[in-house]
Amino acid sequence: MYTRRVSAAAAATPMFTPHHTLLGPGTRAPAPPPVAGIPAAAPVPIPLPPGTPSISVVIPARDEARNLPGVLAELPGGLHEVILVDGASADDTIAAARRARPGIRVLSQPGRGKGNALACGILAATGEITVTLDADGSADPAEIAEFAAALTAGADFVKGSRYLPGGGSSDLTMLRRAGNGALVLLMNRLYRTEFSDLCYGYNAFWTRCAAALDLERIAAADPVFGDGFEIETVLAAHAANARLTVAEVPSYERDRRYGESHLNTWRDGRRVLRAILRERRRDPARTPRTRPARPSAAPRTVSKP
């Protein structure tokens, strides 16, 4: 398994126009707040670069009617499809999504939990690339082009990282930051990888690699481990166990626009810990890998079988 990191500075030509002003490594200025009495202008979709492979965007959602229209409006132009996986929303989530983006594919997840919704959407994707995106507005859809660029550069699976230079977050509490750091250390030690971020839902991969991620069980109606917020860790572990080429790109996590997060730090943190230990035991090969190399700005190999 190969793991690479891709930084924004490594690209000779920018692949998209940033929505934030860079202040330094890991920090960005948030978008200016709306002015009272003046309606916010609708974002202009940034088209994907010519030659980008077809992309399916999978968005799991439950009770996100207020957030989804803004997320869908920010998606880049030229996408192959957008798949909304609804988790039995009690609000106007589906209707709001269809108003904001006519032609959106809507699936109803058979089970419960974010992991179940993501697995269903991933298995239904028909584009060459699948991107997973949260429905709360915390991820910047303009970064999709950077994920696609890392895939076309040779990666099989790309994780967004809030901790690489150029990434950051306005939503991380000290507790979440410390917990993520401890879990990343454990993951890297057990899997001989060099992830910098683990509990972040912005990912992309070649759709042909979905079979290696072993999602059929998680997509079923019956409750199983992996169907909750631990899904991001399960995906990373399955990619590592399958010896996929994994890359990281810097990503900025914004504040949720409306409502409260369904994430519970302690409960879901324990589930992530369990996922790391459980999926390591399921590794069919468990072959030792060399120690990761030191970081560099360019794409690089940091571990080998």
Model-found features: residue ranges?
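Hydrophobic targeting segments
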Residues: 53-59, 68, 75, 81-85
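Acidic metal-phosphate-binding loop of nucleotide-sugar-dependent transferases
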Residues: 137-139
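Donor nucleotide-sugar binding loop of glycosyltransferases
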Residues: 64-67, 89, 114
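Hydrophobic helical membrane-anchoring modules
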Residues: 1-54, 218-305
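Acceptor/aglycone-binding surface of glycosyltransferases and processive sugar-polymer synthases
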Residues: 109-112, 116-124, 129, 141-225, ...
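Short, well-formed alpha-helical segments that are part of the catalytic scaffolds
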Residues: 37-46, 62-77
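A conserved acidic beta->alpha catalytic loop
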Residues: 86-95
